[in-house]
């Protein structure tokens, strides 16, 4: 008899629109994955801070920081891959919605990290969602689309 693993933490409605494969294959991978997408991070959150928080739920295989595809600087997301599915379920249950660097983090299932996904998919190099923000968020580190469209001048920053 075949055993089908039912996650103790439900899958979200979000699906990666760039997934290379069928919807059925993506669902299967999500149900069995030990990889999580972590969103709404501060641009200043370090890999060490993420490791400290998420290792409370189990042994971490790796953390892949999300980077601006042009500047190669952190852009507010990462992937956390555990060795065991149960540890990722603990993180979904206990860390999703908690604060890290004074931001409420979003934790969601991921079908598994593939090289290249660490780069932001937005036109300006960061995340798409940041391009639609209308405010300046110090924790996120940018003005979003308003600067890109010339609606605001770039913030005053001194170069060291």
From Swiss-Prot:
PROSITE patterns: RRM
GO cellular component term, pick one: nuclear cap binding complex
Organism superkingdom: Eukaryota
Family to which the UniProt record says this protein belongs: Belongs to the RRM NCBP2 family.
Keyword Hydrolase: no
The species this protein was found in: Culex quinquefasciatus (Southern house mosquito)
Name the record gives this protein: Nuclear cap-binding protein subunit 2
InterPro entries: NCBP2 (IPR027157), NCBP2_RRM (IPR034148), Nucleotide-bd_a/b_plait_sf (IPR012677), RBD_domain_sf (IPR035979), RRM_dom (IPR000504)
Residue ranges of domain RRM in the record: 34-112
CDD domains linked: RRM_NCBP2
